[in-house]
């Protein structure tokens, strides 16, 4: 179709670029040069004349995005040709955007114009100098609205590629992509709700929180100014725009924030906004005094979810080169409130003094000057407190809460990421058709329900000037001459004949076939037809009615023919050619001539089997013929490759042979060799084919007698005696032997070759590597031991039977099972008169019984039976069962299969559970694993190009194929994961927010804490009386940490111990003030930054849910249930997040009020620092009180011991006095 479209492509008129069907853009929009008015009018005349000639029966509608409010030359010129012109402003408060109502009007006018009449009407788009950023956004909106493209960022980049590289940076000092993408998402959401756009909400913009201080001056900080532009509802029409808020209007001096001092900026605003709003943050540089734009954001209040707007540096319009000015983790939060709740509450900032809180009088500290006289408080100011706070931050960080941090970010990317695939539904057909505009004035609805609110100018000769938006040039931003282009726009402007509608890239070529079967033929020969059925190399064969043998294992020999089928007929499969077998080697001719094609099949003999004649045992073979010259090569037939041969041919002699020396006598008839004399062969390895092939003589050669025995090596090897032909084998080429047939004659089977001193036939030649040679005769090395009888049923019986045409062909030795060795002492030379010598001489004596090799192998094999069975099973399964097709990377496929084993659900049921969003069937861990193993774009393309049997694919590939049945399966899985964790995530976040609110309320409402703080203030003034630090009305919160650092002169107590002692003596009811602060310790472990990240994850998750709900509109029946469940979840989650956002906004205000309560600045002493100081003070106070109690208990015990000691001493003195008195009386009597 693309070729046909190019063939029938009609070039547009000069000066126009075809953007879509019957939609053209003036190519003057892509340049910065301005033509003179006269030349410009001539250019327009030529373009319109060409258009009328090209489309004589069409009507034309032109859109112009002008600068200023005057009627443009473009409109005046096109009016002369009966072209309807609509003009729009080129910007909205400095943003290259239009209000949402004008965007809606433009889209519906275009839809009505293109659909009316006989569908021949044409739309023209034009912008004046510098209007390309807005025109690009309008064109992208048109593509999204008409569903030409999906994905907002991708669509916008496609449009910008039509302009020269660097044009956007040249015309716009700020990157307008984020705000334009936000409004493109508004356009794409038109199908979610029946009413689009939704009603514009009136909100109260409460505050702006900036987390992470941008670096815009030499002191690594900024001095921010917030300005807000919106609709002026106080005007007569209520449609004009104005600056509704500015910090520069206030008389307060601008504060400078530095990264070293704080990391959060909170600016209270409290202004009403509705509809399209532009929020600017400007840095005021005082040296020299100038304004630098930090960021700008444009949004519509109709799409504000949950009364919160969270933005990072990628979602803000910033200067092109200012990306590195923002720290990692920078985020701007705009908090809204309902209009009925917009009245701000005054933050209580009580002055802490003795009169209000009822602390202790100064007289209560009469002993403090005595205890701490001469002891100076720490002179290093905040250093000790700051060091201690750092230690506390390292110890008491929010370890318990950080488990929420990355939970939401796993499921969703940024809402403006490049992976968006948002689509929009068909245009709303319920709107009334747009009539041809030929009047001097056109009414364009600014609101959704009023079509007569705003008047735009139509190109006509009317002298009236319609009312336009007032544009406030509120700041100037120096534009760069040369800037970097982040969009990689094309360097050359498109020609006038270029078409904007981009076709999707062609699919990549299909992957090469995984299984190729090639045969080795001479380069001069054409490829052969399919190989024939296997030939039976025997003069005897089976009856045609006999079923074919089982699938043959590949032969072990080195085959130089291409007839080595690996599957049984019918139909004959292509041979498998593999070079993996290390045992197979290539027999290369010495002259290294190119290999000829394989020989044609022998003629089909009669199906009747003549009875063979009984023949005597074969006589001794004649002497061998002279060896052929080493340089001789057998000519190749010049005939083309043969067609597929008939069914199996029977006969051991070929009909095409090279002339040979006199052959030996004919071979004996086939004999039935008992099982004791030969063992069945093991399954051979896969067949191999190399570049070598058998060279056969001319087809006209008559069939000679039976073939000669194998010749010696072509090299200078000794001439061995020619053995007689071995009994023919009834095995098929490359297949295990079937059961031996009964003898066809009643004559007894001939005995094995007689043993004599004369040389006997050697065993079949072994596997050669490079060249082939016959074995030396018996006794060549002086050995008189008899050779083993030639096995008739193992592999090839002779190289000449059914295969050789008088040519020695190398074959592989039959694979023998390794037997366990008998470790005996070998006798190499039989001594005269010994048993061994007599045994060799007595030929007529009974010989040892024949050994059953098969039984021996089964009993004494070196490999265990289980290993043999496993190997046989593997070999058999690899042949009987076709291999699985592997398209995905092996490691990824293995990991995917391991993951699937953990999901005990069939793939169709799993997909049904995903589409039904059933959290009972799949848990969050399983959903996360499914997200990790979603197919990539490359893997999906690879699977789409696969045309083979899908049953042959591996488990991972089949899993990917199932996932590909659902559109955007990864996005649906992420939505599913968000739904599973949403309830727990919201509950935990709500619990943390409630904890902060409770702790804030407890601290501010605790009367005991207030009295203790007042007591500390009085204590400090008593110590600092008469110094510069005295007569204080309050103290910084970090001063609480210095109470434990100030010691008395005797170093036995600190000021904290004295405070506890004093409170215990004077006001013991205050000692348990910690009971009023139940939630303080838990709140000290919570970081507001973490809560903000969790809140952002919830809001962004809802945005992704909404986007997927919109994108699934076009999925068809497969997503009907998914859409229904997702819509119900979205309605429920929206209310939850809205409640959560209101609670989050309240927590932010309460956290700031807590800092204000202690007279601190929230930017320098945030909520986290306040709670940690108070928690440490509370713990230190309790510890000091306990230590005081222990000290008092110890002193009490000491006093008790001293009292007992004194009492005992007094008692002893009394006893001594009594004794003295008794002695005196006794003396007196005597």
Curated annotation (Swiss-Prot):
Biological process annotations from GO: actin filament bundle assembly; microsporogenesis
Active-site residues, Swiss-Prot/TrEMBL: 127
Stretch list, region Disordered: 412-432, 460-822, 1187-1230
InterPro entries named in the record: C2_domain_sf, FH2_Formin, FH2_Formin_sf, Formin_homology_domain, Prot-tyrosine_phosphatase-like, Tensin_C2-dom
Keywords of the record: Hydrolase, Protein phosphatase
Residue spans of biased composition, Pro residues class: 503-514, 524-535, 545-556, 566-575, 592-630, 637-649, 660-672, 679-688, 699-711, 718-728, 735-766
Compositionally biased region (Low complexity): 484-496
Positions of the Phosphatase tensin-type domain: 1-194
One Pfam family here: PTEN_C2
Family note: Belongs to the formin-like family. Class-II subfamily.
Protein name (database record): Formin-like protein 14
Species assigned in the record: Arabidopsis thaliana (Mouse-ear cress)
Taxonomy of the source species: Eukaryota, Viridiplantae, Streptophyta, Embryophyta, Tracheophyta
């Amino acid at each position: 179709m693309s070729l046909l479209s190019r063939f029938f492509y009609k070039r547009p008129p000069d000066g126009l670029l075809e953007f879509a069907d019957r939609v053209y853009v003036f190519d003057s929009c892509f340049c910065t040069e301005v033509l003179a008015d006269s030349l410009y009018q001539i250019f327009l005349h030529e373009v319109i004349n060409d258009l009328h000639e090209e489309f004589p029966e069409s009507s034309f509608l032109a859109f112009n995005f002008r600068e200023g409010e005057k009627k443009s030359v473009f409109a005046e010129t096109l009016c002369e040709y009966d072209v309807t012109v609509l003009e729009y402003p080129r910007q909205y408060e400095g943003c290259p955007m239009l209000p949402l109502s004008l965007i809606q009007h433009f889209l519906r006018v275009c839809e009505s114009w293109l659909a009316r009449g006989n569908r021949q009407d044409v739309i023209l788009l034009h912008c004046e100098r510098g209007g390309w950023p807005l025109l690009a956004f309008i064109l992208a909106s048109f593509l999204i609205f008409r569903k030409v493209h999906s994905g907002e960022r991708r669509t916008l980049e496609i449009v910008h590629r039509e302009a020269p590289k660097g044009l956007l940076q040249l015309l716009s000092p700020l990157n307008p992509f984020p705000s334009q993408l936000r409004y493109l998402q508004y356009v794409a959401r038109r199908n979610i709700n029946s009413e689009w756009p939704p009603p514009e909400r009136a909100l109260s913009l409460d505050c702006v929180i900036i987390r992470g201080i941008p670096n815009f001056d030499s002191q690594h900080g900024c001095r921010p100014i917030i300005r807000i532009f919106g609709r002026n509802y106080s005007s007569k029409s209520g449609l004009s725009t104005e600056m509704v808020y500015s910090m520069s209007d206030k008389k307060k001096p601008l504060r400078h924030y530095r990264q070293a001092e704080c990391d959060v900026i909170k600016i209270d605003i409290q202004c009403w906004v509705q509809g399209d709003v532009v929020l600017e943050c400007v840095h005021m540089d005082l040296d020299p005094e100038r304004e630098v734009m930090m960021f700008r954001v444009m949004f519509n209040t109709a799409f504000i979810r949950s009364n919160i707007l969270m933005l990072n540096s990628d979602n803000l319009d910033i200067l092109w080169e200012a990306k590195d000015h923002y720290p990692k983790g920078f985020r701007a939060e705009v908090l809204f409130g309902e209009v009925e709740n917009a009245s701000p509450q005054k933050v209580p900032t009580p002055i802490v003094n003795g009169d209000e809180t009822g602390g202790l009088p100064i007289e209560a500290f009469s002993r403090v000057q005595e205890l701490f006289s001469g002891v100076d408080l720490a002179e290093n100011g905040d250093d000790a407190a700051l060091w201690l706070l750092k230690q506390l931050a390292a110890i008491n960080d929010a370890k318990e809460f950080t488990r929420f941090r990355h939970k939401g970010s796993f499921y969703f990317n940024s809402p403006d990421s490049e992976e968006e695939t948002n689509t929009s539904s068909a245009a709303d057909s319920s709107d009334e058709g747009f009539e041809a505009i030929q009047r001097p004035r056109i009414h364009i609805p600014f609101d959704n329900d009023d079509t007569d609110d705003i008047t735009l100018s139509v190109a006509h000769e009317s002298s009236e000037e319609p009312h336009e938006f007032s544009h406030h040039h509120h700041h100037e931003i120096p534009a760069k001459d040369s800037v970097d282009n982040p969009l990689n726009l094309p360097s050359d402007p498109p020609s006038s004949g270029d078409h904007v509608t981009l076709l999707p890239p062609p699919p990549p070529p299909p992957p090469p076939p995984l299984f190729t079967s090639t045969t080795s033929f001479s380069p001069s020969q054409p490829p052969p037809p399919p190989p024939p059925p296997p030939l039976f190399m025997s003069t005897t064969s089976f009856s045609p009615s006999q079923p074919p043998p089982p699938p043959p294992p590949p032969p072990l020999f080195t085959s130089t023919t291409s007839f080595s089928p690996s599957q049984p007929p019918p139909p004959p499969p292509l041979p498998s050619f593999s070079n993996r077998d290390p045992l197979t080697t290539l027999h290369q001719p010495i002259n290294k001539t190119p290999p000829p094609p394989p020989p044609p099949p022998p003629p089909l003999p009669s199906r009747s089997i003549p009875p063979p004649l009984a023949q005597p045992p074969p006589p001794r073979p004649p002497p061998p013929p002279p060896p052929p010259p080493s340089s001789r090569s057998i000519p190749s037939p010049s005939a083309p490759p043969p067609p597929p041969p008939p069914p199996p041919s029977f006969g051991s002699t070929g009909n095409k042979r090279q002339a040979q020396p006199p052959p030996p006598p004919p071979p004996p008839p086939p004999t039935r060799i008992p099982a004791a004399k030969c063992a069945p062969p093991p399954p051979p390895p896969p067949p191999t084919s190399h570049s070598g092939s058998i060279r056969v003589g001319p087809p006209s050669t008559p069939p000679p007698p039976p073939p000669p025995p194998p010749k010696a090596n072509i090299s200078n090897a000794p001439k061995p005696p020619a053995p007689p032909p071995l009994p023919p084998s009834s095995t098929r080429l490359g297949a295990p032997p079937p059961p031996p047939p009964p003898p066809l004659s009643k004559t007894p089977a001939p005995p094995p070759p007689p043993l004599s001193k004369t040389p006997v036939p050697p065993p079949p030649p072994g596997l050669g590597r490079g060249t082939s040679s016959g074995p030396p005769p018996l006794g060549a090395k002086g050995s008189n031991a008899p050779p083993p009888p030639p096995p008739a049923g193992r592999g090839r019986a002779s190289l000449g039977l059914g295969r050789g045409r008088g040519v020695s062909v190398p074959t592989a030795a039959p694979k023998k099972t390794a037997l366990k060795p008998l470790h005996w002492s070998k006798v190499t030379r039989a001594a005269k008169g010994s048993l061994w010598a007599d045994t060799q001489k007595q030929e007529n004596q009974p010989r040892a019984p024949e050994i059953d090799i098969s039984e021996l192998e089964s009993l004494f094999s070196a490999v265990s039976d289980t290993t043999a069975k496993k190997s046989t099973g593997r070999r058999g399964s690899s042949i009987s069962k076709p291999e699985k097709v592997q398209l995905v990377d092996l490691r990824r496929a293995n990991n995917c299969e391991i993951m699937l084993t953990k999901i005990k659900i069939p793939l169709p049921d799993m997909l049904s559970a995903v589409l039904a969003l059933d959290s009972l069937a799949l848990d969050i861990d399983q959903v996360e694993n499914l997200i990790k193993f979603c197919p990539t774009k490359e893997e999906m393309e690879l699977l789409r190009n696969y045309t083979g049997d899908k049953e042959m694919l591996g488990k991972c590939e089949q899993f990917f194929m199932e996932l590909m049945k659902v559109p955007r399966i990864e996005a649906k899985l992420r939505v599913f994961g968000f739904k599973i964790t949403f309830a727990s995530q919201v509950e935990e976040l709500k619990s943390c927010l409630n904890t902060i609110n409770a702790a804030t309320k407890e601290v501010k409402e605790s009367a005991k804490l207030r009295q203790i703080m007042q007591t500390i203030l009085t204590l400090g003034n008593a110590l600092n009386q008469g110094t510069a630090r005295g007569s204080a009305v309050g103290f910084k919160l970090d001063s609480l940490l210095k109470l434990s650092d100030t010691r008395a002169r005797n170093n036995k107590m600190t000021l904290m111990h004295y405070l506890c002692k004093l409170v215990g003596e004077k006001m013991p009811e205050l000692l348990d003030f910690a009971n009023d602060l139940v939630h303080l310790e838990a709140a000290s472990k919570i970081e507001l930054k973490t809560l903000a990240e969790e809140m952002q994850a919830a809001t962004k998750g809802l945005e992704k849910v909404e986007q997927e709900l919109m994108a699934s509109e076009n999925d068809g029946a497969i997503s009907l249930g998914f859409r229904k469940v997702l819509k119900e979840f979205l309605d429920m989650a929206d209310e939850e997040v809205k409640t959560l956002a209101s609670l989050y906004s309240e927590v932010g205000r309460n956290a700031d009020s807590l800092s204000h309560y202690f007279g601190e600045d929230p930017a320098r002493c945030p909520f986290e620092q306040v709670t940690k100081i108070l928690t440490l003070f509370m713990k230190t106070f309790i510890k000091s009180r306990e230590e005081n109690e222990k000290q008092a208990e110890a002193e009490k015990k000491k006093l008790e011991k001293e009292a007992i000691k004194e009492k005992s001493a007094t008692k002893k003195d009394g006893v001594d006095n009594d004794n003295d008195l008794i002695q005196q009386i006794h003396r007196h009597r005597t």
